[in-house]
Amino acid sequence: MSDGRGAEIALNRALWAVVNQRFTDAAANAMWALPEAVWGLFAVPERSLGVLGDVRGRDVAELACGTAYVSAWLASAGARPVALDLSREQLATARRLQHAVGPAFPLVQADAEQLPLASGCVDLVVSEHGVAAWCDPARWLPEAARVLRPGGRLVFLTNSHLSALCVPADEGVAGERLLRGHREAYRVHWEGGGVEYHPSHGDWVRLLRAAGFVVEALHELFAPAGGGDHPFYEIVTREWATRWPAEELWVATRA
């Protein structure tokens, strides 16, 4: 890509190869074994949110799927998912779990900003801590709208805008001070590698509307009582996330 986005994508792909080696490959075993869908760093159960609806018989695209545990849950619930991710390593992990425990569904190495899917081919587009943070929203949202059928649903989870303002630039978890300006979090190039996008609420509404979506809900996720910090991702502590939202779960409908 002539605008430099290609270099950012390559950087993110390299980062996730390392993350898969250090954490997500081993963690996938437990995620695929969970009896129900959960959301985010602190495993908020889908039954308490109800954002996916009845997925039986639905065609689903999971964008930036990682090790595809969301698609595994969806397939077990009767959906027909296709899971897409840029990371060859994470897809290999997903393939390993498919062979070991099932269920089987298509795994596709692809960029969510340029989906290799036909227009109007799915009823649901979903992403759990994937596409919203690691892809340019001005590019992936129109693609999500393109592949959705009219009235189809988009559900995506990302870090809260507040946490993105409070996470240190070098390392460590979010604190109680704002470390960057409100608009500076839209695109963040972390010193440790990787480029993320954290639009504000106003930005998300504008971007979703421009892509042809109607916003249905925004769920701000806090950490449930009890338990410890996430074993790998240094974003927020559980204590922080009991006071302020750690993540945002957006639900929108294609007009």
Model-identified regions with their sequence ranges:
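Short alpha-helix
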Residues: 195-218
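A short acidic, Gly/Pro-enriched loop at the edge of an enzyme's catalytic core
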Residues: 113-124
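A short SAM/SAH-binding and catalytic strip from SAM-dependent methyltransferases
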Residues: 124-138
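Class I SAM-dependent methyltransferase SAM/SAH-binding core
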Residues: 59-114
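A short glycine-rich, Lys/Arg-flanked "PGG" loop and its adjoining helix->strand segment in the class I
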Residues: 138-153
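Conserved class I S-adenosyl-L-methionine
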Residues: 153-186
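Conserved alpha-helix/loop element of class I SAM-dependent methyltransferases that forms part
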Residues: 29-58
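N-terminal, positively charged/glycine-rich alpha-helical extensions of SAM-dependent methyltransferases
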Residues: 1-30
